[in-house]
Amino acid sequence: MVMAKVDPNEGLQEKLVQVNRVAKVVKGGRIFGFTALTVVGDGKGKVGFGRGKAREVPAAIQKALEAARRNMIQVELNGTTIQHPMKARHGASKVYMQPADEGTGVIAGGAMRAVLEVAGVQNVLAKCYGSTNPVNVVRATFNGLKSMASPESVAAKRGKSVDEILN
């Protein structure tokens, strides 16, 4: 259940990944509420995710979008794909992502696809193992994207040239 929208003010793409109805049981019955999980990105490497909780769906989505805008990270992309193959995890969710050639497209499951698309990744092969809980898959994908490093940054950290790193 991924819904997409482009925010005209900031040029951010917004995607709703999940809305979940939750219930609090009280003496008089149940009180229902909603949680929402959203991802936002500028399509150029900036991406964030957020969760919101409220009694009504629109309020939960709005809170989630605000949280996502506050929780953005910058990802160094290699053109339209990721820098290198990577594995990441969060809880029991494990994700594997690898760069793909031009024209491949985003081959990834629901929650991962939403994150990668708003980040601006257009060609990637990705797989989710273990738990497919959307919240944990999004967090695992973020962990992977955060850990990704360009050859230039690795070379600078090691004090070597880019050619030495790549060969």
Curated annotation (Swiss-Prot):
Coiled coil: none
Keyword entries, A-Z: Ribonucleoprotein, Ribosomal protein, RNA-binding, rRNA-binding
UniProt entry tagged with the keyword Ribosomal protein: yes
GO molecular function, one term: structural constituent of ribosome
Recorded GO CC terms: small ribosomal subunit
GO biological process: translation
Alphabetical list of InterPro entries matching this protein: Ribosomal_Su5_D2-typ_SF, Ribosomal_uS5, Ribosomal_uS5_bac-type, Ribosomal_uS5_C, Ribosomal_uS5_N, Ribosomal_uS5_N_CS, Ribsml_uS5_D2-typ_fold_subgr
Superkingdom of this protein's organism: Bacteria
Signal peptide: none
Residue span, S5 DRBM domain: 12-75
Quaternary structure and interacting proteins, as annotated: Part of the 30S ribosomal subunit. Contacts proteins S4 and S8.
Note on domains (UniProt): The N-terminal domain interacts with the head of the 30S subunit; the C-terminal domain interacts with the body and contacts protein S4. The interaction surface between S4 and S5 is involved in control of translational fidelity.
PANTHER family cross-referenced by the UniProt entry: MITOCHONDRIAL RIBOSOMAL PROTEIN S5 (PTHR48277:SF1)
Known role: With S4 and S12 plays an important role in translational accuracy.
Family: Belongs to the universal ribosomal protein uS5 family.
Full protein name: Small ribosomal subunit protein uS5
